[in-house]
From Swiss-Prot:
It is found in: Plastid, Apicoplast. The keyword Flavoprotein does not apply. This is Putative cysteine desulfurase PbSufS. Pathway: Cofactor biosynthesis; iron-sulfur cluster biosynthesis.
């Protein structure tokens, strides 16, 4: 290591140490307690978001349901799209199973085994009632969305995809778990072809263009209801209705991993308007259930009308085993091979009951979006014109002023190619404090409280590392959505903020403050001649 490298490392160490001493040490005495941080006093503008104080107090009070938030120095947690925290009732369900009813299911005839089996099957009924589907036999328990999509992909490729011209549509917005299984099955089984759904510049599916592409060869459409990066809520009711109108034989799969914690499904109601999905995939740990839990809703017509093979082979799925051939049970049990994660499934039932209680108030989504709007309000207050809110797409024939071009992404509809985030926009000036966010909320589009942000002058790793010093948890990287970053944003990675109903107004203010402070600190380090 040469002298220059040593000097750079020493300078970086001194700056980080100074930053820690100046910003963090004093905060430990004041913030990292169970007393909610109050934030600095701001001169607030008239457009500050507001909501009924009774709603705020209700959701502040439910934090007492979560042991995670009762610990000293509880982290300020905004990575809820990665996983959610678990209420005490969910944790107690796991503990009670192992304390008092630990036994296997669908096997023993003794009392605690029968009880375990009954309780396990009762969760199937809880799920069926919560999403209001026709039968509990349409509910298959899984370890999560990744397993669920792989299982569904395997079933579909065997039953539906017959030749190399059969089309499977996904989008650039998908989680890798809804991309790679299709790629690998097509490659290994040498049938089917993968196609991509047209998108608008704001990250919503271009329904008109998509429906025009559908033909008799289109067999599968597999899309997320909500992007785990953008938070956009796709209009799946309209999408499904138009797909089925053009080709009723198409199987529509909805990845509900990000939507299920925030939005309510009513399958029977959707079915009345021909807007219901054929398959719905969820992940338990995203909606306050334990890791290793989830479920897939599959219409009976896909599993009961013709022979269906198991995804995995083994115990608990057979009716008869002969020397060279075996006979299998029907759905849903044919897809629940081996010993299941019983305690996690029981606790998932408890989590759904908890969600039902929260949703009965009718304000969870409203409150989350209030926090989202409040966060952006504070971020605008701190960063002022350094905050760039994308997408900005003017109406056709609207003149673009050069000064406005420097603070917003302004692209005429006729001049935008397949890349969303253009290099000429990225490099338009030398504003090293500039932070980009993707916020379709400002255009009155439907979304959940997820916000990606990034800078061209430091990495998401830099931002998230320094926020971690402040006891703040947000996500960095590509968030398992590689195509979205590479083919839609045209950037390598981003930071992601995701809000849940147990977050507070004080937390979102503190988060905005610290993002601004960290941005200025990183800019200062860069300005002194050393790249971060």
């Amino acid at each position: 290591m040469n002298n220059e490298s040593i000097c750079i490392l020493l300078l970086l160490f001194v700056k980080i140490t100074s930053y820690y001493s100046y910003y963090i040490s004093p905060l430990k005495k004041n913030i990292y307690t169970r007393t909610i941080y109050k934030g600095h006093i701001l001169k607030l503008k008239n457009d500050k978001p507001e909501i009924d104080n009774n709603i705020i107090n209700y959701f502040k009070n439910i934090r007492s349901d979560y042991p995670f938030f009762q610990q000293n120095n509880s982290p300020i947690y905004f990575d809820n799209a990665a996983t959610t925290h678990k209420p005490k009732s969910v944790i107690e369900k796991i503990k009670n199973f192992y304390y008092y009813n630990n036994s296997n299911i669908h096997r023993g005839i003794y009392k605690i085994s029968r009880n375990a089996t009954d309780n396990y099957e009762h969760v199937r009924n809880i799920v069926q009632k919560y999403i209001n589907c026709d039968s509990s036999d349409e509910i298959i328990f899984t370890s999560g969305a990744t397993y669920g999509i792989n299982m569904v992909c395997n079933i579909i490729m065997d039953k539906i995809i017959k030749n190399e011209n059969d089309e499977i549509y996904i989008s650039y917005l998908e989680h890798n778990s809804n991309i790679i299984p299709w790629q690998e099955n097509i490659r290994n089984k040498k049938k089917g072809k993968l196609k991509y759904i047209p998108l608008k510049k704001n990250g919503y599916i271009n329904i008109k263009k998509f429906v025009e592409k559908i033909n008799d060869n289109t067999k599968i459409v597999s899309i997320n209801h909500v992007s785990n990066v953008l938070g956009n809520i796709q209009n799946i009711n309209l999408i499904i209705k138009k797909i089925k109108k053009k080709n009723p034989n198409i199987i529509v799969i909805i990845d509900a991993a990000q939507s299920f914690p925030h939005l309510k499904y009513d399958i029977k109601k959707m079915k009345l308007k021909n807007e219901d999905p054929d398959i719905l995939v969820t992940s338990g740990h995203k909606f306050c259930a334990p890791f290793g839990s989830g479920f897939v809703y599959i219409k009976k017509k896909l599993t009961h009308t013709s022979k269906t093979n198991p995804f995995l082979y083994g115990s608990n799925i057979i009716t008869d085993v002969n020397k060279y051939r075996s006979k299998f049970v029907s759905s849903p049990y044919i897809f629940e091979t081996g010993t299941q994660n019983i305690s996690a499934i029981l606790a998932m039932g408890e989590a759904i009951k908890y969600l039902q209680k929260i949703n009965d108030e009718g304000n969870a989504y409203k409150y989350e979006m209030y926090l989202y709007d409040l966060f952006l309000f504070y971020l605008r207050s701190f960063l002022t014109n350094h905050l760039v809110e994308l997408p900005y797409i003017p109406e056709p024939n609207t003149p673009i002023k050069p000064d406005k071009m420097r603070t917003t992404m302004q692209v005429r509809n006729s001049k935008v190619d397949d890349k969303y985030f253009h290099s000429e926009i990225q490099n338009q000036d030398n504003d090293y404090l500039k932070i980009f966010v993707h916020n379709t909320r400002k255009d009155n589009k439907k979304k959940i409280a997820i916000l990606p942000l990034w800078s061209l002058n430091f990495t998401s790793f830099d931002l998230v590392t320094f926020l971690d010093f402040k006891n703040i948890c947000i996500r960095s990287g590509h968030h398992c959505a590689s195509l979205l970053h590479n083919n839609f944003f045209n950037i390598n990675e981003s930071s992601r903020i995701s809000i849940m109903f147990y977050n507070t107004p004080e937390e979102v203010q503190y988060l905005a403050e610290q993002i601004s402070a960290t941005t200025h600190m990183l800019h200062s380090m860069r300005r002194n001649g050393k790249a971060v």
